[in-house]
Design a protein with these regions (language model features):
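Conserved RecA-like helicase ATPase core segment
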Residues: 135-236, 339
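A basic/glycine-biased coupling hinge at the interface between accessory DNA-binding modules
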Residues: 1-97
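Helicase C-terminal subdomain and adjacent C-terminal extension
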Residues: 347-357, 364-368, 374-458, 500-513
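Inter-lobe coupling/hinge region of RecA-like P-loop helicase motors
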Residues: 183-190, 211-257, 261-275, 309
Length: 513
């Protein structure tokens, strides 16, 4: 077809010039669609890294393609496979090896040496942070254990397994005996960082995950008011907050008041500000009360300029401890805590998700946040949109102190959040002047999922341009038997455009595209 098109263009006087791949790439990235290209590149890089972290071979691409009927997934796997081969080719040309291949090749070589009868003289293999182990590192550990005939000591805490996005598989820890073929479990139940009251709350919270191993931790330390919820109102006088950060003003003021409370009790206290995302620190600095140094992670309070405050994401703070901890954004929203962002559907092939409970990984992450403190945890949350983790703590534990009001009804409503029937992302209700309607719109990236509807009863039916009149839109309408798509230009007196589409036709021919 391309050759025929080329012949026709030349025949009609067009001068064709072959462009290099680099020129084509530059042409694409210099357009407005560049952001989509960069997101695709990032997605492919993440996929390939996790693909190799799982120890998969190229045959997996063919296996997955044969198992899916989703056209987008098939296209992605095809493109990703070509990128995978090109990446492998470049590594070979440069006589280079990446980190994932170092581990995979090491496991392969050890298994080859074992077959040839060679051995290594090690009696013990100790693996720390075992809860974050990936399949490839497990394969390396197992191969090393076999060739040495060594005892494997795996040290870790499954309650703190928070790196599924990077390839870790929690079941390799929780089902250690099954995966290794043998084993004895020895529990370390005594801790010295957290007070018993913090442990009881954090432990009760995390063990709602059915996939977690059950244990009871004990500490010699005790404290009153181990977890303090500090709520703030978002309904502030705009004139009063003008030039002070607008909607971020109350967050900054609340954090400042908490710092003041901590310093009154201990002027030398180390204070950690914890965020779910890195931009939580940037948002805090927009309150006009704080200055954030992104390079060092240091935060300076204008009210307490001599006090050293440190900001970290929860992932970065894992393993560290501070006198007091402030979780700065416990809000019920897409980028709140728990995060309601869902990964691209294609990553399900290479990321091991824990579906034992809603937000299982986020729950472990929140547990890590709670246990960074040596004394108290302060949680900053809005009155009207509190994190569902916050309302759960208040409901389940009587010694969680609440300063301010909490509208728990919001959390109940959030449990019924409307989700896209195509990709599962939350739906947002917006008025769109272009259509003259309030529409439910998928919050996913438009190039990934463009679902929108005027009526959720239509299921997967999404608004389309009307091909018949080229002026109206096909929106969900209620039929005698089931919903269908009908043109907005059709009038109640049965005049106007009669363009329509049945649900069966839409699902069979349109949605598949």
């Amino acid at each position: 077809m391309l050759e025929h098109l080329k012949e026709q263009l030349i025949e009609h006087g067009f001068v064709l010039k072959q462009r290099s791949s680099q020129e084509v790439f530059q042409k694409i990235v210099n357009t407005e669609e560049n952001k989509y290209i960069l997101k695709l590149v990032k997605l492919i890089c993440t996929f390939i890294q996790n693909f190799k972290t799982n120890g998969y071979t190229v045959e997996k691409f063919y296996e997955w393609e044969s198992q899916t009927t989703n056209e987008r997934t098939r296209l992605f796997l095809d493109v990703c496979q070509q990128c995978y081969h090109e990446y492998a080719k470049r590594l070979k040309e440069k006589r280079a090896v990446d980190f994932e291949d170092m581990i995979n090749e090491s496991a392969r070589i050890l298994n080859q040496q074992l077959i040839s009868g060679k051995t290594l003289d090690f009696k013990y293999i100790i693996v720390d942070e075992y809860q974050d182990i990936s399949r490839q590192r497990f394969d390396l550990t197992k191969a090393l254990g076999k060739i040495c005939d060594a005892k494997i000591i795996a040290v870790g805490d499954d309650w703190q397994s928070i790196y599924a996005y990077a390839g870790s598989d929690i079941t390799l820890f929780t089902k250690f005996k099954e995966s290794m073929g043998y084993g004895q479990e020895l529990k370390i139940t005594r801790t010295y960082r957290n007070a018993q009251e913090v442990i009881d709350i954090a432990g009760g919270f995390i063990q709602k995950n059915d996939s977690q191993l059950k244990k009871a931790l004990v500490s010699p330390k005790h404290i009153q008011d181990p977890v303090v919820i500090e709520s703030y109102t978002e309904e502030v006088d705009r004139k009063q907050t003008k030039g002070k950060g607008g909607k971020y003003y109350m967050i900054g003021k609340t954090v400042e008041d908490i710092v003041d409370t901590i310093l009154e009790e201990n002027p030398k206290s180390s204070i950690l500000l914890l965020g779910r995302y890195g931009f939580d620190a940037y948002n805090l600095s927009r309150s006009a009360d704080f200055i954030y140094d992104e390079k060092t992670g240091g935060v300076q309070s204008k009210r307490f300029p001599g006090v050293r405050l440190e900001f970290m994401t929860v992932h970065r703070a894992k393993g560290l401890g501070f006198d007091n901890v402030i979780i700065v954004n416990a809000r019920n929203e897409l980028y709140g805590f728990p995060s309601q962002i869902q990964e691209d559907p294609v990553l399900k092939f290479v990321v091991k998700d824990d579906h034992s409970i809603e937000y299982a990984e986020e729950r472990r992450l929140f547990y890590v946040a709670l246990t960074r403190t040596k004394n108290r945890v302060y949680i900053v949350t809005p009155e009207q949109h509190p994190s569902k983790f916050v309302t759960e703590l208040i409901s389940d534990f009587k010694n969680v102190k609440v300063n301010g009001k909490i509208n728990e009804v919001d959390d109940a409503n959030s449990a019924n959040i409307k989700r896209c029937p195509i990709c599962g992302y939350p739906l947002q209700l917006r008025y769109k002047p272009h259509y003259g309607l309030k529409l439910w719109i998928c919050s996913n990236e438009p190039e990934i999922c463009d679902f929108m509807t005027n009526d959720l009863r239509g299921g997967e039916l999404s608004i389309l341009k009307c091909d018949k009149c080229q002026d109206g839109y096909l929106i969900v309408k209620e039929g005698k038997v089931e919903p269908f798509l009908g043109c907005t230009n059709y009038k109640s007196d049965k005049t106007g455009c009669s363009g329509f589409m049945t649900k069966d036709y839409y699902l069979k021919y349109i949605r598949k595209k």
